[in-house]
Amino acid sequence: MAKMRISPELKKLIEKYRCVKDTEGMSPAKVYKLGENENLYLKMTDSRYKGTTYDVEREKDMMLWLEGKLPVPKVVHFERHDGWSNLLMSEADGVLCSEEYEDEQSPEKIIELYAECIRLFHSIDISDCPYTNSLDSRLAELDYLLNNDLADVDCENWEEDTPFKDPRELYDFLKTEKPEEELVFSHGDLGDSKIFVKDGKVSGFIDLGRSGRADKWYDIPFCVRSIREDIGEEQYVELFFDLLGIKPDWEKIKYYILLDELF
């Protein structure tokens, strides 16, 4: 606690809680779980990420906008202090989908939940959404991250069929081959570790820094990739699209998976 760059006001809010650092996440944010029963979470990003989708101020703005539209954590406190953005929030309601359902035991249920998420997202009115994650916006952000050595890139973890030798080559391809977009609400980083469930239904979402207006296909490739990697049978990819009532656009799916290699 002593090493945290937080204001006296925030310190007073959290001093009674037991503080445990979360080591699961892959983003540059620092995340702490506070408490054991009525939990709070403190998420912190340094000023180098200001204005990017990693910045917790952006996540705070989206959480406030999503109140009444989607089940999201409550914003308890936000501040910029000593070069850091600090977001204190409530715990999401329910249990993580990744903990509630085993992929090999409940594949149909997981597919149903992914489809439910996509339908929920696409039903939201985005006319006053505070952030746009169009490809122009994401690629401009990516250029900044690459130029400042802030991009989360590990070429060894790229998909086996990724034909690019380095991040800049992939970036150039993504900029040249941008598909047309039809904007809807998008989570931006969807997966079973971002979805909470309760009584068999979606009950919450976390990690909302990349949410906002984006192409309607933006979240779908994350679901397809998770189904293939975690369940492994192509029939469940087909079931996913059957539940959505659409045919897969494989070019867009491949494009957005490639884009995610650099975030």
UniProtKB/Swiss-Prot annotation:
EC number of this enzyme: 2.7.1.95
InterPro entries assigned to the protein according to its UniProt record, in alphabetical order: AGP_Transferase, Aminoglycoside_PTrfase, Kan/Strep_kinase, Kinase-like_dom_sf
A GO BP annotation: response to antibiotic
Active site: D189
Keywords per UniProt: Antibiotic resistance, ATP-binding, Kinase, Nucleotide-binding, Transferase
Listed Gene3D superfamilies: 3.90.1200.10, Phosphorylase Kinase, domain 1
Catalytic reaction(s) noted: kanamycin A + ATP = kanamycin 3'-phosphate + ADP + H(+)
Pfam families registered for this protein in UniProt: APH
GO MF terms held by the record: ATP binding; kanamycin kinase activity
Sequence similarity: Belongs to the aminoglycoside phosphotransferase family.
The protein's role, per its UniProt record: Resistance to kanamycin and structurally-related aminoglycosides, including amikacin.
NCBIfam families per record: APH_3p (NF033068), APH_3p_IIIa (NF033064)
Record's protein name: Aminoglycoside 3'-phosphotransferase
Organism: Staphylococcus aureus
